[in-house]
């Protein structure tokens, strides 16, 4: 079973021009084009090697600034179009948000390497008694703002540490709870 996602990327995608002898695919056709031909990530990687992703407008709309995540049971990849062509990144976090570019999002996860779903061990000083006064204190420092960068860190932490149930119904429910960790309520984020 394959899945896909996409995010809008603010004016940094660089699509290629149509090339003779290559499979030219418009950015808005990428996901159905891939899912119509591939059953797993291995097949996706082979197919992408033959493709030229172009910035064809959709009707009167300009070419959408998109990047993509494609996943199967074996893992996930992220696709971004840059001035150097289509970049295919392994995505061990299995999540994606708008900005910054994917390699930077992954690098910035280093800022949260000390976070844990477990209660923290007190290492500050043996001279000061500490008391954990709430569950979830191992995740203190996890960003809570609505920026793409913060949502990436938060959803990566939640996805990588959450536990799904044994049934498909429980797993689908957990999927929506993970998405809920990065909800943006109307009016809280202008622009």
Predicted features, each with a name:
Residues 76, 80-85, 90-92, 110:
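Aromatic/basic-lined ligand-recognition segments
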Residues 12-19, 88-93, 99-100:
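A short, polar/proline- and glycine-enriched secondary-structure boundary/capping micro-motif
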Residues 40-41, 45-81:
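Aromatic- and glycine-enriched pocket-lining scaffold segments that form the walls
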Residues 1-10:
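Single conserved hydrophobic/aromatic residue that forms the stacking wall/gate
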Residues 7-8, 71-73, 82, 158:
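Structured loops at beta-to-helix junctions and adjacent beta-edge loops in soluble globular domains
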Residues 26-30, 93-96, 103-106:
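Glycine-rich loops and low-complexity Gly/Arg-rich segments
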Residues 57-58, 63-64, 73, 97-191:
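C-terminus-biased signal that marks the final domain/tail of proteins
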Residues 11-52:
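Compact, glycine/acidic-enriched structural inserts
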